[in-house]
C-alpha cells in the first residue's frame, strides 16, 4: 500500500502549516506565599526520655511476640 503522505506514515497529516514561534525561556514557578493569620495549634514535640522510650519499645515488642504466638495457636487449631 502506497502511503498518501510520503515518509510520514508514523505522523498524522499536518492540516495547516503553523507559524513557528520563538521559544520562550521557561520561568520557574514561584513558591506560594505562606499566610499566617494565627499561631499554629500544633503543640511542640517534647522529646521523651531515652529510658522511657526504651521501656515502651520493649513493651511493644513483648506484646507483638504474644500476639504472634496467639495467632499461631489459633491457626494450628483451625488445621486440626
Curated annotation (Swiss-Prot):
It is found in: Nucleus; Chromosome. One of its GO terms (cellular component) is nucleus. Residues 1-36 have a biased composition (Basic residues). Keywords: Chromosome, Developmental protein, Differentiation, DNA-binding, Nucleosome core, Nucleus, Spermatogenesis. GO terms for molecular function: DNA binding. It comes from the Eukaryota. Involved in nuclear basic protein transition: histones are replaced by spermatid specific proteins which are themselves replaced by protamines in late spermatids. N-terminal half is highly basic, while C-terminal part is acid. This is Spermatid-specific protein S2.
Amino acid at each position: 500500500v502506497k502511503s498518501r503522505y510520503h515518509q510520514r506514515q508514523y505522523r498524522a497529516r499536518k492540516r495547516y502549516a503553523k507559524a513557528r514561534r520563538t521559544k520562550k525561556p521557561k520561568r520557574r514557578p514561584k513558591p506560594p506565599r505562606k499566610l499566617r493569620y494565627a499561631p499554629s495549634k500544633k503543640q511542640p514535640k517534647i522529646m521523651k526520655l531515652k529510658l522511657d522510650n526504651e521501656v515502651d519499645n520493649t513493651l511493644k515488642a513483648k506484646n507483638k511476640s504474644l500476639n504472634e504466638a496467639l495467632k499461631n495457636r489459633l491457626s494450628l487449631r483451625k488445621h486440626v
